[in-house]
């Protein structure tokens, strides 16, 4: 019961994402590895502020390394002043520890528990090819509408609560009436890793898909950094 729209570029995602954000009625959850000030984020932030004025709950979580180059130090405080619940995940420290490698690489947007975006596209101008860093940047994503969105709502809340002393209940965000899409085909399940878990969920999913493929295997990624295990499976 989930409709999937393939977003073949950052430019495609950008326009659709803004349109869906403007439809939000109850809550908006954003969890991104990279948020960078610029045309893209300024446009998104403008909509978020508009939604705050309408009474929509908005939360923004970004990886702590953004404060080293992408965002001002303490940027989450500015967002809080705007009425947005915000926090950096694993803030960067002036001293090195092994926990500095515990990064939040997710790119998740959930709207009202009914619409979700995920994929490899961050909220920065280079991902939409508004500015150029390494030539034309090719990355992809998907928009989901239907039952599978609950998985992404839960993934966000679980990561949000990692640093919370008082763990809130999830029911009011998960018990959402989701209409069945007319074009839903196949089976969709959201999944995710986190820096604190010992099980490599993402790697296991990829290896299973590779090892059980019988007709074709298509892989698209702007990064190709694979280990010996995956190379052997391929």
Protein language model regions, located:
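Charged, low-complexity intrinsically disordered terminal segments
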Residues: 1-234
């Amino acid at each position: 019961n989930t409709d999937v729209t393939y977003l073949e570029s950052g430019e495609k995602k950008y326009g659709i994402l803004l349109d869906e954000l403007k439809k939000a009625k109850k809550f908006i959850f954003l969890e991104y590895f990279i948020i960078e000030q610029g045309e893209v984020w300024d446009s998104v932030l403008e909509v978020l502020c508009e939604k705050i004025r309408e009474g929509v709950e908005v939360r923004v979580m970004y990886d702590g390394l953004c404060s080293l180059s992408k965002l001002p130090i303490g940027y989450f405080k500015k967002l809080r002043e705007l009425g947005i619940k915000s926090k950096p995940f694993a803030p960067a420290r002036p001293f090195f520890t092994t926990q500095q490698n515990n990064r939040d690489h997710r790119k998740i947007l959930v709207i009202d528990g009914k619409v979700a975006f995920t994929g490899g596209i961050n909220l920065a101008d280079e991902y939409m090819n508004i500015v150029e860093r390494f030539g034309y940047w090719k990355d992809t994503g998907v928009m989901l509408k239907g039952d599978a969105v609950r998985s992404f709502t839960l993934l966000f809340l679980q990561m949000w609560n990692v640093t919370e002393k008082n763990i809130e209940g999830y029911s009011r965000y998960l018990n959402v009436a989701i209409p069945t899409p007319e074009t839903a085909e196949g089976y969709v399940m959201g999944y995710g890793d986190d820096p604190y878990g010992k099980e490599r969920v993402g790697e296991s999913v990829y290896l299973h898909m590779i090892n059980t493929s019988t007709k074709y295997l298509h892989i698209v990624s702007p990064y190709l950094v694979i280990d010996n295990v995956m190379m052997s499976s391929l």
